[in-house]
Regions:
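Acidic, glycine-anchored loop motifs typical of Ca2+
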Residues: 29
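Small-residue-enriched hydrophobic alpha-helices in membranes
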Residues: 1-22, 34-130
Length: 130
C-alpha cells in the first residue's frame, strides 16, 4: 500500500511542496509564465487525484504567504524540502523574492548554513543542466 507523508496540516506533503512553489512564485506580486510552467510541470509529475489537483489550482488563485508555508513542516527535513521547493520555483532576481526566501527560511527554522548548502546545490544543478 502507498503511504504518503503528511504535512503538519494533515494534507499530503507533496501538496505542501507545490503550495511552497506557488507562494514563492507570487512573492513579487504575480506568478510569471516561467514560474507557472515550473509549477505545472511539477504538478504533472505527481500522482494526484482530482481533489488534490483542484486544491492546488485553488492555491494558485489564492497563494499562501511565507508564514502559512512555514506552518506546514513536520521537522527540519520537511522544512528544508519546503524551502528548496520554493527556491526551485523562482529565480530570485527581485528583492521581494529574496526577502521571501529569507522570511521562509526563518519561519521554517532552517539554519543559515543549511540554506547556504541548499542554495549551492541548486546552483550546481543549474550549472550542470546548462
Amino acid at each position: 500500500f502507498n503511504v504518503r507523508p503528511l504535512a503538519a496540516d494533515g494534507q499530503p506533503f507533496e501538496l505542501a511542496l507545490v503550495r511552497a512553489m506557488i507562494s514563492a512564485a507570487n512573492a513579487d506580486g504575480h506568478i510569471g509564465p516561467d514560474e507557472q510552467r515550473r509549477i505545472f510541470d511539477h504538478i504533472a509529475k505527481l500522482d494526484l487525484n482530482a481533489g488534490d489537483k483542484a486544491f492546488l489550482f485553488d492555491a494558485i488563485s489564492k497563494p499562501d504567504n511565507a508564514a502559512a508555508i512555514s506552518g506546514l513542516a513536520n521537522g527540519l527535513e520537511q522544512a528544508s524540502e519546503l524551502w528548496l521547493a520554493a527556491r526551485l520555483a523562482i529565480d530570485p532576481d527581485d528583492p521581494r523574492e529574496e526577502a521571501y526566501l529569507t522570511e521562509l527560511a526563518t519561519g521554517l527554522k532552517v539554519p543559515d548554513g543549511l540554506v547556504a548548502q541548499l542554495e549551492l546545490r541548486m546552483q550546481n544543478q543549474q550549472t550542470a543542466a546548462a
